[in-house]
Amino acid sequence: MTLKEFKDQNKLSYKALAKLVGASDATVARRWCLEKSHKDAMIPDRHFMTSIIEATMGQVMPNDFYRD
């Protein structure tokens, strides 16, 4: 499952998603949810990746940021 799918399925705003994973800015969370081909897309660093795995209870994993 992608982070965007998790966000949408749980009806979270980007601000709520950022807070859930410990990011200080909703813009960062928004960039994590963009298609990987988008010029502004970002992949979370190790710290946030761990937070994302924990916050989503394993529904979003690192490989989900790399698949098409």
Regions found by a protein language model. Name each.
Residues 1-21, 50, 54, 59-63:
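A short, Lys/Arg-rich alpha-helix, primarily the initiator
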Residues 13, 24-28, 45:
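Short coil turns linking two alpha-helices in DNA-binding domains
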Residues 4-7, 30-31, 46:
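Basic side chains
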Residues 23, 34-35:
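Alpha-helical DNA-recognition elements
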Residues 1-2, 35-37:
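Short, contiguous strand/loop micro-motifs
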Residues 36-55:
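Short, basic-rich loop-to-helix N-cap that marks the start of a DNA-contacting helix
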Residues 29-31, 60-66:
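Solvent-exposed interaction patches of small proteins and small membrane subunits
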Residues 17-18, 28-32:
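Conserved hydrophobic/aromatic packing and binding residues within compact polymer-binding modules
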